[in-house]
């Protein structure tokens, strides 16, 4: 990066955006900001949950300037509650929300995902919330606050894993080779020269798999005929598939 130029990281997220720095604690900065609010559709912030109130950028602070303004806050833990003053970062939220207890191998440590998925998902939820707020404001002429938190977004994405645990005897755990907790085979497999993924999400995919690898007898076995059968006999089936896949390179299987 040459002096005076933006980093590749910065350009990844901000290319073609225009920016303006304002000190909202100064009279001149506040005046410019309020002029912008009068002619804008939305005010978006990505700050600690208690900061929008301190900076006076919530709907109640700005509605006298523009009754239709939509104020969206994306924070770690929301603008209210016991953790509103806590900062929130992707890595921390992956741990707090339980993602790391589900990621990695069973005999390894809790592991974060390779990408900042809490940050990304929180941003998507904030964008959807903001769009809903804008739709309502254009329909009714009244804006409001959109209070979005990384924590809420991350917990929401536990979906079926959380539902299984709360409604059955299922206990979420890290699965070897990134395998699916109920679908078998649905995971990474090692070939002679690398790794690839097999994903039998439907019975017909299982039938096609055994035909493609030349082991139709697996589909005929009563031990592997259905989803339930393969789940019960997971270890035995995976051992057989591992022995088959390791014999040939990835290009052969794909």
PLM regions and their residue ranges:
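N-terminal helix-loop segment corresponding to the beta1-alpha1 unit
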Residues: 1-145
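Electropositive phosphate-/nucleotide-binding environments in soluble metabolic enzymes
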Residues: 7, 27-30, 34, 111, ...
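Glycine-rich beta-alpha junction loops
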Residues: 76-78, 150-155, 193, 201-205
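Aromatic-enriched alpha-helical interface/lid elements that frame and gate functional surfaces
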Residues: 179, 184-254
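Short beta-strand->loop
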Residues: 115-121, 150, 198-200
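Oxidoreductase and adenylate-handling cofactor-binding alpha/beta cores
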Residues: 123-144, 156-168, 210-217
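Conserved ATP-binding loop and adjacent catalytic segment of the adenylate-forming AMP-binding
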Residues: 168-175
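Short, well-structured alpha-helical segments that form the helix of a local strand-helix-strand
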Residues: 146-152, 254
């Amino acid at each position: 990066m040459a002096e005076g130029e933006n980093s590749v990281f910065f350009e990844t997220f901000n290319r073609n955006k225009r920016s303006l720095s304002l000190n909202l604690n100064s009279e001149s900065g506040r005046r410019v900001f309020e002029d912008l609010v009068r002619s804008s559709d939305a005010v978006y912030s990505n700050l600690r949950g208690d900061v929008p109130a301190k900076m006076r950028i919530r709907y109640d602070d700005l509605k006298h300037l523009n009754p239709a303004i939509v104020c969206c806050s994306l924070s770690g833990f929301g603008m209210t509650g016991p953790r509103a003053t806590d900062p929130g970062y992707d890595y921390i939220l992956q741990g707090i929300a339980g993602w790391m207890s589900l990621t990695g191998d069973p005999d390894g440590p809790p592991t974060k995902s390779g990408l900042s998925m809490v940050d990304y998902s929180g941003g998507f939820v904030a964008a959807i919330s903001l769009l809903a707020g804008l739709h309502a404001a254009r329909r009714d002429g009244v804006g409001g606050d959109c209070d979005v938190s990384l924590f809420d977004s991350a917990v929401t994405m536990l979906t079926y894993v959380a539902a299984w645990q709360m409604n059955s005897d299922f206990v979420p755990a890290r699965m070897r080779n990134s395998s699916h907790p109920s679908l078998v085979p649905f995971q990474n497999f090692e070939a002679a020269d690398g790794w690839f993924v097999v994903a039998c999400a439907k019975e017909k995919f299982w039938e096609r798999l055994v035909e493609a690898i030349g082991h139709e007898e697996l589909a005929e076995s009563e031990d592997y005929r259905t989803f339930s059968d393969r789940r019960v006999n997971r270890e035995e089936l995976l051992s057989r598939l591992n022995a088959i896949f390791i014999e040939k390179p990835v290009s052969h299987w794909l």
